[in-house]
A protein has these predicted regions:
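Glycine-rich phosphate-binding P-loop
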Residues: 5-19
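Conserved beta-strand scaffold positions in the cores of enzyme catalytic domains, especially
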Residues: 29, 104-106, 161-163
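ATP-dependent small-molecule kinase phosphotransfer cores
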Residues: 35-86, 126
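N-terminal targeting leaders
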Residues: 100, 111-114, 118-122, 138, ...
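A short beta-strand-loop structural module common to alpha/beta enzyme folds
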Residues: 27-37
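Short glycine-rich anion-binding loops that position phosphate/pyrophosphate groups of nucleotides
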Residues: 65, 93-95, 169
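Extreme N-terminal starter segment of soluble prokaryotic enzymes
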Residues: 1-3
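RNA pseudouridine synthases
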Residues: 81, 87-101, 105-111, 115, ...
Length: 273
């Protein structure tokens, strides 16, 4: 039992590799269509997603509430999928959202630029110049997406357990390589620890959803950390009543064994002229 995340460059055959991997491993493929369906079901429409989905958001988009909503519910959708285990999560920063999960195997699919250009020319029926423009825009958008949402450099090979260059291999053989590593990478100890970690991450996400989105309690920059059902709330509030209400909301959730606050209380003040 494992979770595989795949980050891929445009024209690196990442999607094709993931499909092959799903077939030989029996793992469920969590792709763009799956995640879009999840986000649609909770009100993150295509119109809202188009500003952020594996894109480099503009200045105003990066400051909007829609950005926070998109990121929160993207995490929710990915964690819900990961909780089922035995899945392959395509893109969307899955390897960052699940960072630290012991039975998660992170993979990057890449290819030489010259190969990517030829593949892009075939796909779009364009010349070299246009193909290069398409690739550069995609790389810029995906790099910006990871930087703005996760403060990470997705081109850094240290972010991944395995990087595969498909310049000289096909998706079928790339998938076999990933599956072979998966079989030796994930043992019983990692599996058990990973399942527990996912449970903690899901509960932390549920806590934030309950406080911010369900009850709309005014706690700013709210984060929840969870370890085996013990929850610590972090953030900023300007009233003790907000902190108390947030703690009560946390205690009401199934799976919470203990909850405490590390929320900073900052009293409002007025600057006099």
């Amino acid at each position: 039992m494992a979770i595989i995340t795949i980050a891929r460059e445009l024209a690196s055959l990442g999607e094709e590799t993931a499909q092959e991997l799903s077939q030989i491993s029996g793992y469920k493929l969590i792709d763009k269509e799956y995640l879009e369906g999840k986000l649609n079901s909770i009100g993150i429409t295509a119109e809202k997603r188009q500003k952020y989905d594996e894109r480099n958001p503009g200045f105003w988009a990066s400051l909007s509430q829609q950005r926070d909503d998109y990121l929160h519910f993207l995490k929710t959708a990915i964690l819900d999928a990961a909780q089922e285990n035995n899945c392959i999560i395509m893109g969307r920063g899955g390897y960052v959202i699940l960072r630290g999960v012991p039975h998660m195997l992170s993979v990057k699919i890449t290819a030489p630029l010259s190969v990517r250009v030829e593949r892009t020319k075939r796909t779009f029926g364009c010349d070299n110049k246009r193909a290069l423009q398409i690739i550069e825009q995609s790389d810029h958008d995906r790099g910006g997406f990871h930087k703005y949402f996760f403060s990470t450099d997705w081109t850094d090979g240290r972010e991944y357990d395995l990087t595969i260059n498909t310049g000289n291999t096909d998706p079928a053989h790339a998938a076999v390589a990933i599956d072979s590593l998966r079989k030796v990478f994930v043992d019983k100890v990692k599996e058990e620890a990973g399942v527990q970690k996912i449970e903690d991450l899901v509960l932390a996400q549920n806590v934030v959803t309950e406080i911010i989105y369900a009850r709309k309690i005014p706690v700013h920059f709210l984060e929840a950390t969870v370890e085996r059902g013990s929850v610590v709330l972090h953030g900023v509030a300007n009233a003790q009543s907000s902190i108390d209400t947030a703690l009560a909301a946390t205690h009401s959730l199934s799976g919470v064994k203990h909850a405490e606050s590390a929320i900073q209380l900052v009293q409002e003040f007025t600057v006099m002229p």
